């Protein structure tokens, strides 16, 4: 009866907004013992997103307490008053709160981001100048690519959080005029034995799969890792790659007095309001109450928007176009205006809505998905209107360009906000901070590990091999990728012959693109500068192992709070390591994303995730006939190791998970050698001196050999190097090593070439029919190892 009375009250007070009713019940249930199940919330509810706090904050007399509630500090509140020459109203305050959030302004990171190499090479745009990086790939074509995070939304509502992350990153690509051809993702979850982790994993993977499969872009690669530091704060990083004519780029700009402004795509609702602010704060025990900040995606609507946008891009009607992502209309209008050194007059009454009685600030800040803002040449209005009518999408003229630095928003005949466009944007009036940073005291503990503390004679090599083969961080991610479509658009070159990077066939040319995402957060936690340089180097190794040349990167920086000096030190050192490595490889940074506040506060204790700077790298293979797979080809082929091993088990999965030694230095790494190795691998491919190449990384040499053998159900017979500990040789993760194989009749040419190059290499052994042999001992057969490797994660998920 109490519940019925409560619902009647809510229905009367809040009208038809069922989600507000849900939130009220949820809050009241804590006091009147009504049982609600927030984990099983119907996704239809999410269409009615808005919190009580924001819904009722429409007061006239704005004070600092209101600004603080929206995430602004006192200094920023005073700066806003100074910029406007008055106290802002609530709508204006909301505008600044989202545009000056870390998610939109990069106010705590831009000072360091600017130190990265941001131009040169094959880049057609500088970093951050457009919605995504753009690289010349030859034949008059360009590749647009970018990676971004959707961590906080995925922690609270994993299905929609992951799905809209995929949708948003694809819009960044096609808003430039490029057709998306490939997706990758980098995912981090907590202990996989934990039921909450399993729930997050299921929902995130389903969200990515459902959206991407329906949208029609293949997933060609990525990574999934598990560690307890991500128990309550998963990381969901999505990367999209598109191809276009390099002369047809659409810029995110608005200029030309009187040129009309259109909003196109889906209708606007209350979902995602203050999503940018939500992404710029810590996760807490009450973060489930922020489900209203999560966006809701529709991949079928996005597919229509893609086709309409690309059709419009081929006309002469368009001035500029911008995706409506974080901060919605206000972000798109301010960024396009600032870039064009202009302003806009916008009538919010003209915005197509899917919910009644929306306030002006709600329309401005809504992050409803599948929407674009388009600036059209005056007199060409019929072109955009006809195209979007053809695709059955909204196309509403909501304003025009003005020749002054102002954004003037009106609603129902009344001006509700008037702010300078330049004052809102990154690189303009948005604040820039240089935070305090200090090396954490715990770093000293990582420096004192001694390999002799692990007696070699006590190690059962067979047991370690089995343990690592079935470990969730090493084993096949088949359970994940089988839920993704990898064949749509028929561009995937690695279906039958997997390689160290995803490969895109650029149809109509001899060119292929190589794509990868890489990061080992254990290395970064042990040494942020070195660990991030290793992430860049491993990405370059993966690209080069296919035969392609690394050309550029995009990055996704996942860290704790910038107000924590120790977490900020990790970020600063990581940027330094990335910059050094990118300069060495001549792979400029095209753009990316910084995601701070990846930490959870529970019972007053704040736990950050391990620092995770994910590197998305693009490579170009100028002749796709030179593509090299990772898999052994046939029995009798010769196996060599390029690079030097070491008595090094630092930060390895073997040391961390098998021996449970959580603190050790980052593994052996030589950046200069990595650059030489990358160039060498490209030449080996071009000269066709090898049949397979696979880099040594997580799990060490043994796992590299196993992964090379499994695709064709082959085995290996190798001899370890007597000068090193056998466990270090097989399971250590010292960097700069690659396993290659070749026909016996290629061996002499390979050896002669390597001797001339003066790059260390050594004979390991040969490919067998299926047995795994090391130092004349049998380690079993490939059939059994493959069964364990392929099904380990699936069996855990089914428990």
Task: Identify what each model region corresponds to.
Residues 4, 12, 16, 21-22, ...:
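Short, positively charged and aromatic/hydrophobic N-terminal segments
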Residues 57-799:
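Glycine/proline-enriched, intrinsically flexible loops and inter-domain linkers
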